[in-house]
């Protein structure tokens, strides 16, 4: 499910097995080189869908008020629960995933990791994003959680502006194959401010800091609270 420039969204009681992302929340899908390749000499677009992209780019539709709950996710390749990276300078806020189960995730690379992920990209801002009461089974690969700055799928090669108020609460991973989760700001300006982690467990053991074997938090993440 790709939700593009949507607001006031509820997803509940679904079972999803997808090759790509199970649920992704973004501004719109497209890259500058694609738009250029489908623009005629008179300035018209040869792909009709680009008119939608152009309209959204001009009007800056913010993305907010999502609840994704009571779902079971299996992703053969990509993320299970993703916010970003296509943002195009708009604001993402008030997004909550809760009471979901992850059966499978196999994506283990340096750009797109994370059964749960926030990709802070494309000049967007990201605020009040929560993952709560999530069970992650012994996935084949990838990370349980990842929040980081990237310019993947960014129209102008831009990273995100900032992120704040990210919550992980009652996250239970059981298994041995997931690689360590990470939360990474990019620099002093492009930072993550306000992270709350409560009862994040790996094989029943609580994760209590950001420098252990299961979670890395870098110096550009501020105001981190472990509950």
Identify the function of each model-found stretch.
Residues 1-227:
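Extracellular/periplasmic carbohydrate-active domains that bind, remodel
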């Amino acid at each position: 499910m790709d939700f593009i420039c949507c607001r006031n969204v509820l997803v509940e009681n679904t079972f999803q097995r997808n090759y790509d992302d199970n649920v992704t929340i973004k501004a719109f899908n497209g890259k500058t080189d694609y738009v250029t390749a489908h623009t005629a000499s008179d300035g018209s677009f040869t792909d009709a869908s680009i008119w939608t992209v152009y309209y959204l780019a001009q009007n800056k539709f913010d993305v907010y008020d999502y609840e994704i709950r009571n779902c079971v996710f299996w992703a053969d390749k990509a993320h299970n629960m993703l916010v970003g990276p296509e943002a195009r300078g708009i604001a993402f806020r008030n997004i909550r995933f809760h009471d979901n189960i992850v059966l499978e995730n196999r994506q283990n690379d340096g750009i797109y990791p994370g059964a749960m992920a926030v990709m802070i990209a494309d000049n967007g801002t990201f605020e009040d994003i929560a993952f709560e009461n999530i069970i992650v089974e012994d996935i084949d690969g990838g990370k349980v959680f990842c929040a980081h700055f990237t310019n993947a799928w960014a129209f102008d090669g831009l990273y995100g502006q900032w992120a704040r108020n990210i919550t992980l609460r009652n996250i239970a991973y059981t298994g041995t194959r997931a690689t360590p989760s990470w939360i990474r700001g990019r620099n002093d300006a492009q930072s993550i401010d306000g992270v709350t982690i409560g009862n994040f467990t790996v094989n029943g053991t609580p994760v209590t800091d950001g420098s252990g074997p299961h979670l890395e938090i870098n110096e550009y993440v501020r105001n981190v609270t472990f509950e």
